[in-house]
Amino acid sequence: MLKVAINGFGRIGRNVLRAVYESGKHQQIKVVAVNELAQPEAMAHLLQYDTSHGRFGKRISHDQEHLYVHHDACPQGKGEFDSIRILHLSEINLLPWRDLEVDLVLDCTGVFGCQADGLEHIKAGAKKVLFSHPGASDLDNTIIYGVNHETLKAEHNVVSNGSCTTNCIVPIIKVLDEAFGIESGTITTIHSSMNDQQVIDAYHSDLRRTRAASQSIIPVDTKLHKGIERIFPKFSNKFEAISVRVPTVNVTAMDLSVTINTNVKVNDVNQTIVNASQCTLRGIVDYTEAPLVSIDFNHDPHSAIVDGSQTRVSNGHLVKMLVWCDNEWGFANRMLDTALAMQAAK
């Protein structure tokens, strides 16, 4: 049993805890603690009720020091439940990971992300750390599960899980490059609103993000091309990306255009994705030609879902694809896959 602690109980932290149970991985992963500055009542409420993902199928209760995940519908104090320690500490070095025998910290704060931060968790008693965002270049490894998780080694103690968008697009790039050879590419990320945007116009260091999230399509900076280069150094200076935020609360679409070496038709491209989704990337990549819209991919655990009805090929070598992902739920599920891969690494 892998004992994990979740540091930061925001969108990703709460989804990670839900995914432990909804994916069935609670047989392999035990969450022993959550560190979050918010009050226990709010933590329990937002875990139980979620605007994007609906009501959690497990009943949640709490006291001032614990969250309780009940295995059945019995009243509080009866039936089986899992007890999760609640902590409210802002300094990593004060966290009681040693006393709690924590094997792995899932750091979902979005604040910490360099090797030194990870080592602070380890000094506090954790054995390993997995960050929920790209992190600094000095980490032991950055993993896009399904693409390079087999590069994990036992000595890789401070690891990044990449970003939701790299987890979405990198598996597709891998498939296309192995099948046809990629020369270069561009990506437009069409991303749902995030909590770094404003409900109504208000001050922000990024002037575009001073504007109300629900009223505009808002361009934002992205380092997605750098994330691709980190996984595939061969594509240094070969990809560029832009990103816009749109007034939806969840699910992201990625418009991928690549120039390839091989002369192909639409069916060649789509069949390659289908084959990967049924074999090497099963559970990571999915494929559909149904006439779906963004809400239909909400709570989908795959990293990427290719809409084959939108694949286009120009002059045999320019390929355009539409790739969907639930930027919260898919990423949370990959956090758990990577956590187990870190545990198993030799």
From Swiss-Prot:
Site (Activates thiol group during catalysis): H191
Amino acids binding substrate: S163, C164, T165, R209, T222, K223, R245
Subcellular location: Cytoplasm
Database matches in Gene3D superfamilies: Dihydrodipicolinate Reductase, domain 2, NAD(P)-binding Rossmann-like Domain
Keyword Oxidoreductase part of the UniProt annotation: yes
Pfam family, one: Gp_dh_N
Assembly and binders: Homotetramer.
Function description: Catalyzes the NAD-dependent conversion of D-erythrose 4-phosphate to 4-phosphoerythronate.
Name assigned to this protein: D-erythrose-4-phosphate dehydrogenase
Source organism (scientific name): Vibrio vulnificus (strain YJ016)
